[in-house]
A protein has these predicted regions:
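Bacterial N-terminal signal peptides that target proteins for export
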Residues: 1-9
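Bacterial N-terminal signal peptides
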Residues: 8-18
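Acidic, low-complexity Ser/Thr/Gly/Pro-rich repeat segments typical of extracellular/periplasmic
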Residues: 22-183
Length: 183
């Protein structure tokens, strides 16, 4: 009975450690309602790996230099992202990550220096937010595989492949292969 107790205790400890590690996932950052008078919208939730990150202010800003890169980006991210920031309207700043910079399944924590554009209380000078890049998944559905008596060595394969996010044609072609089982 002693070995059963030791085994049971070991399993209980392993289950506890496993549950604890599962609950220690990164949490989304949701900005305080104190930002509502200054920020209409921000990029959050789950986004595509080809998305841009935007902050929409509640009021138009005078004298913005539209569609030209900002010299000092007001954004910072963890993990780090390389890219450029632009005014896309009088009240919206957009960060455009370099191609391939957003990694599927990754939670990013962003900081936007709101105090650079609007006079706000000291505690509101930086807007912290988060977003997660969608995991890459796909489904493959094949139609029946007809083999004809006139051409028993040939088969025509038809089907649909659907991805959870935008994928380049070249990447799909690399995924698909066909073989007759011979070397």
């Amino acid at each position: 009975t002693r070995s059963i107790s030791a085994t049971g205790l070991f399993l209980l400890i392993m289950m506890t450690v496993g549950l604890y590690s599962c609950t220690r996932t990164q949490k989304d950052i949701i900005p305080s309602a104190d930002y509502a008078p200054y920020v209409n919208a921000y990029t959050g939730g789950v986004i595509s790996q080809n998305s841009t990150i935007r902050i929409e202010l509640t009021h138009d800003q005078p004298m913005v230099d539209m569609n030209n890169e900002l010299k000092n980006t007001p954004f910072s991210f963890s993990p780090s992202l390389k890219g450029k920031a632009y005014w896309v309207s009088n009240n919206t700043i957009e960060f455009v990550p370099e191609e391939g910079a957003l990694k599927p399944g990754t939670l990013y924590e962003g900081t936007f220096r709101l105090g650079d554009f609007i006079e706000v209380d000291k505690k509101l000078k930086e807007l912290n937010f988060s977003f997660r890049v969608q995991e890459r998944n796909f489904t493959l559905q094949l139609e029946s595989l007809p083999i004809t008596a006139t051409q028993p060595n040939e088969i025509n394969i038809k089907g649909d492949i659907r991805f959870s996010d935008v994928v380049k044609k070249e990447e799909v072609e690399k995924m698909l292969t066909a073989s007759d089982g011979k070397k």
